[in-house]
């Protein structure tokens, strides 16, 4: 067993994850913490993504600073929380992320196919699977150890069909299938041994290294379930489609964020609200944390230090910043925001404090603003400190072994130095008009679908 992480004590492999890691307070009161951790559109549950902010935070600022029809931008969209929330609240959205997983999740949420279309698509793939002779899939041993052979054959068949073309060319149905299956690809089993996931029992939020997982499987005699992937996928889709989704279809890019904001893709002075969380400083490698899901999307060897996929993603995502390089990155990001924000617009940046082993936490948001804010063309109009107990943060599992997030996130609220944003809404409404009769309706839709097959 590893000396730095006691998985058995944390019970990550033996029991399901908690529904939420929320429970904080801000220096201005509860704000978005005042509502249930379950608040938000059902599509938000498509796939976990380390470092994400909750839908209710996005809603709080969308309601505070925009009106229906306004344009919302998230240049580091992660799992697509902000653009999804913008759409269901009647706002237009532009989103962007270089991480292939983030790009797929965001596009799937901002332009999903209809319930019938996605299920017809899944059924057609299932028919092809059963009509063709299936050979043993050619997959890395790091992947093979996670799944029952029958489960893996289904996964590999679906994957081979998706990878006939580049991710950016995928249809709404392909994106939804890819995102939904990514969400059930690996996760913890229930106490009775059953599972809605496809893998051995393991964390859902992130992936430990292949070497560690292999050792843990052997030491704990873990067994992978023999799953009907198509049925588990339909179960997942039924949960995702619990709520209605209407509003303007979002536009999603897979580019360097600062380049996007200085390109002709976004006209100057057109964005009402930027809401985003830039990559945290040295806290997580967004490639290796998702190496299993990235394999599913066609990127090999991300889990290995010298793997080809690891090298290409590290180069593209550029997440191994020193503070000096992070400062340069942040300055470019602010410069791009200054260009696209309207004079009455606002930028909301969620930035986490970080700490190195044996050192005092670095108040990253305050320090980075002090260092680069004056020359950014933006001004600070508010600074919110969001306290979250360290034991509720996923980053606690790395212990004292590397730079990590602390219990505090900070929210920088910025405006153009020559602008005057409208006052924030005094009251934020928490009604969810997109709720479509809840889980009972989802079960009924799934039952009707199965009866029709």
Give the positions of each predicted feature.
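S-adenosyl-L-methionine
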Residues: 1-67
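SAM-dependent methyltransferase catalytic-core segment centered on the flexible catalytic loop
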Residues: 263-264, 269-273, 279-346
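Conserved phosphoryl-transfer catalytic core
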Residues: 101-165, 299-316
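Class I S-adenosyl-L-methionine
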Residues: 369, 377-438
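Conserved proline-anchored active-site loop of SAM-dependent methyltransferases
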Residues: 58, 70-89, 93-100, 106, ...
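SAM-dependent nucleic-acid methyltransferase catalytic core
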Residues: 155-160, 164-276, 281-284
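Alpha-helical packing segments of well-folded alpha/beta enzyme cores
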Residues: 54-57, 154, 158, 326-333, ...
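Conserved Class I SAM-dependent methyltransferase catalytic core
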Residues: 174, 312-382
């Amino acid at each position: 067993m590893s000396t730095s992480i006691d998985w058995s004590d944390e019970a990550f492999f033996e029991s399901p994850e908690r529904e939420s890691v929320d429970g904080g307070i801000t220096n201005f009161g509860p704000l978005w913490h005042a509502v249930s951790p379950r608040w938000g559109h059902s599509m938000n549950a498509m796939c976990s993504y380390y470092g994400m902010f909750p839908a209710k935070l996005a809603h709080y600022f969308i309601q505070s600073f925009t009106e229906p029809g306004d344009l919302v931008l998230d240049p580091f969209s992660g799992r697509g929380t902000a653009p999804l929330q913008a759409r269901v609240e009647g706002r237009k959205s532009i989103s962007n992320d270089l991480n292939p997983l983030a790009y797929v999740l965001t596009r799937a949420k901002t332009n999903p196919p209809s319930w019938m279309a996605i299920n017809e698509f899944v059924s057609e793939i299932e028919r092809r699977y059963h009509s063709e002779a299936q050979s043993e899939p050619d997959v890395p041993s790091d992947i093979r150890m996670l799944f029952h052979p029958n489960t893996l054959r289904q996964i590999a068949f679906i994957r081979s069909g998706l990878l006939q073309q580049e991710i950016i060319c995928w249809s709404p149905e392909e994106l939804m299938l890819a995102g939904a299956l990514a969400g059930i690809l690996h996760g913890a089993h229930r106490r009775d041994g059953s599972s809605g996931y496809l893998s051995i029992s393991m964390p859902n939020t992130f992936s430990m290294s292949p070497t560690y997982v292999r050792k843990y499987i052997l030491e704990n005699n873990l067994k992978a379930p023999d799953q009907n992937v198509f049925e588990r996928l339909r179960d997942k889709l039924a949960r995702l489609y619990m709520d209605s989704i209407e509003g303007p279809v979002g536009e999603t890019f897979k580019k360097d964020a600062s380049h996007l904001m200085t390109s002709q893709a976004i006209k100057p002075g057109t964005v009402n609200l930027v809401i985003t969380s830039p990559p945290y400083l040295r806290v997580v490698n967004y490639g290796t944390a998702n190496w299993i899901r990235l394999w599913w999307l066609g990127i090999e060897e991300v889990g290995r230090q010298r793997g080809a996929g690891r090298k290409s993603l590290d180069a593209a995502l550029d997440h191994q910043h020193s503070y000096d390089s992070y400062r340069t990155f942040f300055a470019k990001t602010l410069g791009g925001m200054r260009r696209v924000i309207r004079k009455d617009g606002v930028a909301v940046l969620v930035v986490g404090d970080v700490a190195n082993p044996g050192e005092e936490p670095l108040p990253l948001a305050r320090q980075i603003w002090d260092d680069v804010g004056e020359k950014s063309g933006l001004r600070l109009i508010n600074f919110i400190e969001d306290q979250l107990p360290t034991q509720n943060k996923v980053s606690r599992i790395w212990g004292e072994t590397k730079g990590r997030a602390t219990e505090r996130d900070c929210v920088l609220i910025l405006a153009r130095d020559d602008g005057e944003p409208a006052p924030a809404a005094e009251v934020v409404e928490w009604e969810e008009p997109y709720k479509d009769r809840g889980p009972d309706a989802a079960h009924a839709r799934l039952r009707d679908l199965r009866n029709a097959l």
